[in-house]
C-alpha cells in the first residue's frame, strides 16, 4: 500500500540518535531500524569513536544522515569544520546559535561553497537554540534571565537572518517559531516523548504526533524506540501514528 503522509510530511520524519559508544553497536541499531525510520543521527559520542568512517558506514543504509556535533568556535574554525563535514555528504549538521552572526554566516557559506565545489546537495546547517535538556533555572545559571521561549525566538531570528535554513528546538517552541519564521525554515525537534515514556535528560517534551502537527520537519526520537523491547515495532508504531 502506498504510504499517506500528513501535511507536514513528505518523507518518514523519524531520525534515530545513535548515542552508543562503538561503531559496531551503531551499525547493529541502524540495520535493525533502517526500514522503519527516515534517518540516523551521529553525535559526539559515536563520532569521537568512529569518525568519518562510521558516518560512511551508516550512510550505506541509504537514509538521511544527521551529523550532530554542534560546532561553536571562532568563525574561521567553524567554517573549516563545516566544510569538512560537508565533504562527508551528510544531510543535516548543527552549530550553536550562540556563536553569533559572523559564525553563523561563515558556517552557511562554507556549506554552500563546499557543496558547490563537489557538485553535491548542500547540507542543511541547523542552529541549536537552547538545549532541550535545559529548564528555566539552568538557563538563568548561564546568565540569561529571559524566558526560555524568548531566548529561543531571539536566537532563531538572528540565525535565520544570517542565512541558516533550519533550527533545532524543543517541540514546545514550535508554535512560536512557526509564527515568526518563514515557512521554508526546517525545524528539527528532539525531546519527543509520549506521556507514558520516561523523560530521561529531556526537560521540554511533546508527543510525536503533536510535534508534527505543530510544524516539526524532523523528529529525533531515541530511547522511546531504542530502549523498547522491540525497537523496530516501536518505530513502526510511532510512524503509523503520524499518518
Indicate residue ranges for each PLM-predicted region.
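C-terminal helical cap(s) of enzyme catalytic domains, especially alpha/beta-barrels
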Residues: 104-114, 212, 225-243
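N-terminal amphipathic alpha-helix/helix-capping segment at the start of soluble metabolic enzymes
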Residues: 1-28, 117-120, 174-182, 206, ...
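Short, acidic/polar
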Residues: 21-33, 75-84, 148-158, 203-210
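Active-site beta-loop-alpha junctions enriched in small/polar residues
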Residues: 17-21, 43-47, 72-74, 98, ...
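Structural motif
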Residues: 35, 61, 88, 162, ...
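Hydrophobic faces of well-ordered beta-strands that scaffold small-molecule active sites
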Residues: 12-18, 40-42, 65-69, 93-95, ...
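Conserved anion-binding
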Residues: 8-11, 77-165, 170-173, 180-184, ...
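Glycine-rich phosphate-binding active-site loops on the catalytic face of alpha/beta enzymes
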Residues: 88-101, 191-195, 201-204, 208-234
Amino acid at each position: 500500500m502506498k504510504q499517506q503522509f500528513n501535511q507536514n510530511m513528505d518523507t518518514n520524519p523519524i531520525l534515530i540518535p545513535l548515542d552508543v559508544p562503538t561503531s559496531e553497536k551503531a551499525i547493529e541499531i541502524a540495520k535493525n531500524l533502517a526500514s522503519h525510520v527516515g534517518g540516523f543521527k551521529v553525535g559526539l559520542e559515536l563520532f569521537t569513536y568512529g569518525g568519518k568512517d562510521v558516518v560512511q558506514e551508516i550512510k550505506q543504509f541509504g537514509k538521511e544522515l544527521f551529523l550532530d556535533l554542534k560546532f561553536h568556535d571562532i568563525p574561521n574554525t567553524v567554517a573549516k569544520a563545516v566544510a569538512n563535514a560537508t565533504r562527508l555528504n551528510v544531510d543535516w549538521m548543527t552549530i550553536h546559535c550562540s556563536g553569533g552572526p559572523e559564525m553563523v554566516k561563515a558556517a552557511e557559506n562554507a556549506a554552500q561553497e563546499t557543496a558547490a565545489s563537489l557538485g553535491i546537495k548542500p547540507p542543511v546547517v541547523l542552529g541549536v537554540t537552547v538545549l532541550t535538556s535545559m529548564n528555566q533555572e539552568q538557563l538563568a545559571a548561564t546568565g540569561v534571565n529571559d524566558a526560555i521561549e524568548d531566548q529561543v525566538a531571539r536566537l532563531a531570528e538572528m540565525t535565520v537572518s544570517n542565512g541558516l535554513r533550519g533550527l533545532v528546538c524543543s517541540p514546545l517552541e514550535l508554535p512560536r517559531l512557526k509564527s515568526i519564521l518563514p515557512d521554508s525554515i526546517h525545524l528539527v525537534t528532539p525531546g519527543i516523548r509520549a506521556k507514558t515514556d520516561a523523560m530521561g535528560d529531556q526537560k521540554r517534551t511533546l508527543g510525536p504526533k503533536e510535534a508534527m502537527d505543530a510544524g516539526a520537519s524532523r523528529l529525533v526520537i531515541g530511547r522511546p524506540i531504542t530502549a523498547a523491547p522491540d525497537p523496530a515495532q516501536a518505530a513502526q508504531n510511532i510512524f503509523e501514528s503520524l499518518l
